[in-house]
Regions:
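Active-site catalytic motif of lipid deacylating hydrolases and related acyltransferases
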Residues: 1-54
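Short hydrophobic segments within beta-strands
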Residues: 4-8, 60, 83, 138-140
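Active-site signature of alpha/beta-hydrolase-fold catalytic machinery across serine-
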Residues: 71, 75
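Short active-site oxyanion
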Residues: 55-58, 134-136
Length: 189
């Protein structure tokens, strides 16, 4: 089973999730992309329950989903693909606490309350420098939210694809589906 973990303010129905869902369906491999709570502890609990429900699991995490995937990969010894991952979510998402205290939900343009207590929860899931080679990093230097060099420094032994240009959403992710499949060895599960 491959589980896609979406980013902050996104959902399991986002564009990357849908592209990946269609790809995994085309190769007849199990895939889920749950829509997770914005509350970190609830999101992690949901993901832990899913991981513990399946025999063999791989993760694909994007942005905040990459941060969660690092924590879960280290806890459960899983392979993960990280797409422009947030490696220091506490610092990055501190910016999301606006004057109103609300952050946007990109699925339906609603908003949700994002507070300091949520940042405190995120701290529980931080992992320092990762020496494992169980990771594939897909990074675009043009990411306007995160500095790709932070992920390179945090997970120096990862397999890496680093592209010039691009965006935080990672333009052209479908060009890398074969690399993702090969790295996760989904055909051998």
């Amino acid at each position: 089973m491959t589980i896609f973990i979406h980013g902050f303010g996104s959902s399991g129905q986002g564009s990357k999730a849908n592209l990946l869902r269609d790809y995994f369906k085309s190769i007849d491999r199990p895939f889920i992309a749950p829509s997770l709570s914005y509350i970190p502890k609830l999101a992690i609990t949901t993901l832990e329950e899913l991981i513990e429900s399946y025999n063999k699991v791989n993760l694909i995490g994007s942005s905040l989903g990459g941060y969660y995937a690092i924590y879960l990969s280290e806890k459960y010894n899983l392979k993960s693909v990280l797409i422009n991952p947030a490696t220091n979510s506490v610092q990055t998402l501190k910016r999301a606490i606006s004057l109103t205290g609300y952050a946007p939900n990109f699925y339906d343009n609603s908003s949700f309350e994002w507070r300091e207590s949520h940042l405190e929860m995120l701290k529980e899931y931080n992992r320092d420098r990762i020496e494992s080679n169980r990771y594939l990093l897909l990074l675009q230097k043009g990411d306007n939210v995160l500095d790709y060099r932070d992920a390179v420094a945090k997970i120096p032994n990862a397999t890496m694809v680093i592209e010039d240009g691009g965006t935080h959403q990672f333009e052209g992710i479908e060009r890398h589906f074969n690399i993702i499949e090969e790295f996760l060895e989904v055909n051998n599960n």
